[in-house]
Design a protein with these regions (language model features):
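N-terminal cofactor/phosphate-binding cores enriched in small/glycine residues
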Residues: 3-73, 78-88
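Phosphate/pyrophosphate-binding active-site segments
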Residues: 1-2, 294-413, 514-518, 524, ...
C-alpha cells in the first residue's frame, strides 16, 4: 500500500516512468512516506545511507555507472544543505542527480518550527531546475504537480544531464498508507535526441498524426520571418489539417476559430464532432482565451514543437511529446507533416488506416464548413459606429491599398479586433500582454523601417505610454489610430463585474482625457473623429498624409 499523499504518489509514478531504478535514502520522519513509496513500488532499489553528504555522493556514483537518473532522498531542513557538495560536483560532471527533499508546508517556513528553512532555492546555482510540488486538491493542482515533476526530470536528463531539486512539502499526518495503486501519470517525451530536426523525428511525428482521427495544429504567435517570409506553409497545411492560427501567427489570413469555439462552447452538444484527439502546438501564446480554455478541457494529447525544448511549456495541459525545431527549420517541417498523405507507402493499408483517414477527412470538412460560416458572418456583419467598425474599416482600406503598411496592435480590445479582421501579419507585445510599451515598440520599429507603421491602440494604453512621443526621433512614417471610448472597455466584457460599484471608476478607469494636447506638445499631427463619416475620412487621411511628423487619429466612440 502506498502513501495517501497525492504529491508523493505522483512523484513516485513519474520516477518509474522516467526509468529511475536506484534511490539512496536517508533517515528522517518528514521524508519517511517518500522512502516508503520508493521501496514499496518494487522497481526502485533503495540504498540506505545515514549521512546526507555521503548519500548524495553515493547517488552520484550510481548515476555515473548506470548512466541513469538516480535519486537521493532526504528529510527537511539542513539535511538538504548537506547534499550541496555532491550536487555541485554533479553539476560540473553533468550527472543526472535527482535530489528529492521532504519539506514542511510553506506556511510554516520561518515560523520557528523545527527543521525548516527556505528549501526551493537552497541549491539554486548548482541545479538546472528546482521545483516545489503542491499538495493537490483539485484537478488543476494535480496537473501542476505532474507538470513540475516532468519538468524537473526532463531538465535532469535533457541532452547534457544535470542535477535537479524536487522539493516535496508534506502536511501532517505523515504516515497513512492506504492507497492500493500508484496513479497512471502522463510523461513528457522527447521525440528527438538531437538538436537538429532529423528524419527519424519527422517519421515519428508523422506516425502520431497518421494514427490520429481528429488531428489539430495550433500556431501561436511567431516572428514575422518564421517561414522565410512566406505564408505558403500554413495555407498549404490547412488543406490537410484543421489549423488554428491568428494574424500574430504568420498565417496571412484570419482563421475565425475563436468565434467557432465560442459557438461550440455555447452549444456543447455539437462539441464532440469538433474535438481533436491529437494536437500539435507551434509557437507562443494565443490571443483567444476561449480557445485555450476549450482545448484544455478536451484533454487531447499534445505535441509541442519548440526551439527551446529544455524549457518546454504545457499550454494545453496535455503535453505528451516535445520536438526540437527552430524557426529556420519550420519551413522544412511543415510540408513533411502533410507528406503522410502523398507517401502512403510509409504506412500499412489496412482497414484501420483507411477508417482513420476517413475520420480525418470528415473532421477537416466539418471544421472547414464551420470556419467558413464564421468568416462569412464577419465579412457580412456591419457593426454600428464603434471600435469594431473602426478596425474593420481600417483593415479594409489597407487591404485595398497598394501602400506597404506594418500594423502594430496594442493589447486588450485592439488586438482582439485584429484577430477578426486582419488578413496579414500583426505585431503585438503578446509575450506578457501588458498595456505598457505598445506605442514605444511601434515607434522604435519605425525608426529602422522605411514603410508606413500604424499603431492601433486603446485609450488607456496610449495615455500610459504617451512618453513614446516625447522625443525628436520619430518621423512621418509613424501613424497612430487611437480608439478612445473613455475607459478600459474590455473590462465591461468580464462577467458579473458590472455588479461592483467600483467597476467603472476604479477598475475600468473612466476618464475624459483626449490626446490633442499631447500631440500639440510633441509635434504630432492631430485628427479627431466623432462619427462614422469623420472616422472614414480620418483613416484615409491617416494612411495618405505626407509629412515629416507622426500623425494621430483619435476616434471617439461609446463602445
Amino acid at each position: 500500500m502506498y502513501s495517501n499523499k497525492e504529491n508523493i504518489n505522483i512523484l513516485t509514478s513519474l520516477l518509474l516512468e522516467w526509468g529511475v531504478t536506484d534511490a539512496v535514502v536517508c533517515p528522517g520522519s518528514r521524508n519517511a512516506a517518500i522512502v516508503h513509496n520508493l521501496n514499496d513500488c518494487g522497481t526502485i532499489r533503495c540504498h540506505p545511507i545515514t549521512d546526507e553528504r555521503s548519500a548524495a555522493f553515493y547517488a552520484m556514483g550510481i548515476a555515473l555507472n548506470t548512466k541513469r537518473p538516480t535519486v537521493v532522498c532526504v528529510t527537511s531542513g539542513s539535511a538538504l544543505l548537506n547534499t550541496a557538495p555532491a550536487v555541485a560536483e554533479a553539476y560540473y560532471q553533468h550527472v543526472p542527480l535527482i535530489v528529492v527533499a521532504a519539506d514542511r508546508p510553506q506556511q510554516w517556513i520561518d515560523q520557528l518550527d523545527g527543521q525548516t528553512l527556505p528549501q526551493p532555492d537552497a541549491l539554486n546555482r548548482f541545479v538546472r531546475r528546482s521545483v516545489s510540488l503542491p499538495e493537490p486538491r483539485t484537478e488543476e493542482e494535480r496537473w501542476y504537480c505532474n507538470r513540475l515533476v516532468n519538468e524537473a526530470l526532463h531538465a535532469a536528463t535533457f541532452r547534457q544531464p544535470a542535477p535537479v531539486l524536487i522539493n516535496v512539502p508534506i502536511t501532517e499526518p505523515l504516515f497513512t498508507f492506504d492507497v492500493a495503486e500508484l496513479p497512471k501519470e502522463r510523461r513528457f517525451r522527447m521525440l528527438d535526441s538531437e538538436a537538429a530536426l532529423t528524419n527519424t523525428t519527422v517519421e515519428v511525428l508523422q506516425q502520431e498524426l497518421y494514427q490520429a482521427k481528429r488531428p489539430l495544429i495550433v500556431v501561436g504567435q511567431m516572428a514575422a520571418d518564421s517561414f522565410g517570409c512566406s505564408v505558403f506553409d500554413i495555407n498549404e497545411l490547412s488543406k490537410h489539417f484543421v489549423v488554428f492560427a491568428e494574424p500574430l501567427s504568420n498565417s496571412g489570413e484570419t482563421i475565425h476559430f475563436d468565434e467557432a469555439v465560442r459557438h461550440l462552447t455555447a452549444h456543447p452538444e455539437l462539441s464532440p464532432d469538433y474535438t481533436p484527439d491529437y494536437t500539435i502546438y507551434i509557437g507562443d501564446t494565443l490571443v483567444s482565451k476561449a480557445t485555450r480554455r476549450w482545448l484544455r478541457q478536451t484533454q487531447a494529447p499534445s505535441c509541442l514543437i519548440t526551439a527551446d525544448p529544455l524549457h518546454a511549456s504545457d499550454p494545453l495541459m496535455s503535453l505528451r511529446h516535445i520536438v526540437t525545431c527552430d524557426n529556420a527549420n519550420l519551413a522544412l517541417l511543415m510540408p513533411m507533416l502533410y507528406d503522410i498523405y502523398t507517401h502512403c507507402d510509409l504506412h500499412t493499408n489496412d482497414e484501420v488506416a483507411w477508417r482513420n483517414e476517413e475520420s480525418r477527412t470528415m473532421f477537416l470538412n466539418k471544421w472547414k464548413s464551420l470556419l467558413s460560416q464564421w468568416a462569412n458572418h464577419a465579412a457580412a456583419y456591419e457593426p454600428e459606429y464603434s471600435q469594431m467598425a473602426v478596425v474593420k474599416y481600417f483593415e479594409k482600406l489597407i487591404e485595398e491599398s497598394a501602400v506597404c503598411v506594418n500594423t502594430h496592435y496594442a493589447n486588450s480590445t485592439a488586438v482582439r479586433l485584429a484577430c477578426i479582421y486582419a488578413n496579414h501579419y500583426v505585431w503585438c507585445n503578446r509575450g506578457v500582454n501588458g498595456i505598457e510599451g505598445s506605442l514605444s515598440t511601434a515607434a522604435g520599429f519605425s525608426l529602422t523601417d522605411h514603410d508606413l507603421n500604424v499603431c492601433i491602440i486603446g485609450d488607456l494604453s496610449f495615455f500610459y505610454d504617451q512618453n513614446a512621443l516625447w522625443n525628436n526621433c520619430v518621423g512621418g512614417n509613424l501613424r497612430i489610430l487611437l480608439l478612445n471610448n473613455s475607459c478600459g472597455g474590455i473590462f465591461k466584457q468580464l462577467p458579473n463585474l458590472h455588479r461592483s460599484p467600483v467597476a467603472d471608476t476604479f477598475v475600468g478607469a473612466s476618464h475624459t482625457t483626449t490626446a490633442q494636447g499631447i500631440c500639440a506638445q510633441n509635434n504630432v499631427e492631430y485628427i479627431a473623429a466623432h462619427n462614422q463619416e469623420e472616422m472614414q475620412h480620418g483613416i484615409s487621411a491617416l494612411l495618405t498624409h505626407k509629412g515629416n511628423s507622426p500623425v494621430l487619429l483619435e476616434v471617439f466612440t461609446d463602445a
